Amino acid sequence: DAGFMYAAKMSGQSESYDFFTPDAGELAFLADELAPHPFYTRGFILHPNDNVPDLIRRAYQHQNAARYLLVKGESDYIVHKSQVVQKVDQPSFEAMEAIGGTGDTLTGLLSVLCGADFELTDAAVLSAGANRWSGHYADPSPATQVIELIEKIPQALVKVLNEHNGKNDNER
């Protein structure tokens, strides 16, 4: 979680971890080699969505990133050792930004898929996709509660796993 990423950065242990799942604001803290706490992050945070690749580069440059990053946002960036290997941006729902807990569902999906021995890049891509598809199936509004998305995770996982395995939605 975010608090643990902060502790890993400040202890110099970031590179010891397989994954961090920051949003753009949390990534700005990882990218700022001088900030001892997110409150002190320099101006990077003011334009977080249009400079994500630069923030990724800076976080790795200063050894403040895990081996993999799954940067959450309008587009989800899957990164391995400073290289963006994939972006997941569909389906997209503005309303999901207002739903508390979607980062937790993403982290949970990622943990499950890593625990199921998926290759780490695949686990990140699939979890980002499943999290987004759970939103699609829940048809979110700003009033949607995260439990409504959680209830759609099995359906979303079937979809992304079928696509990953080369099956269409009608095959089981």
How does the language model describe each region?
Residues 24-26, 84-89, 96-98, 127-143:
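Glycine-rich phosphate/pyrophosphate-binding loop at beta-loop-alpha junctions
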Residues 132-172:
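Charged C-terminal helix
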Residues 52-61, 119-135, 146-154:
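Short, well-structured alpha-helical segments that form the helix of a local strand-helix-strand
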Residues 1-3, 22-25, 30, 72-74, ...:
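Fold-independent oxyanion-binding glycine-rich loops
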Residues 52-97:
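Conserved phosphate-donor
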Residues 45-50, 88-111:
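Gly/Ser/Thr-rich active-site loops/lids in small-molecule metabolic enzymes
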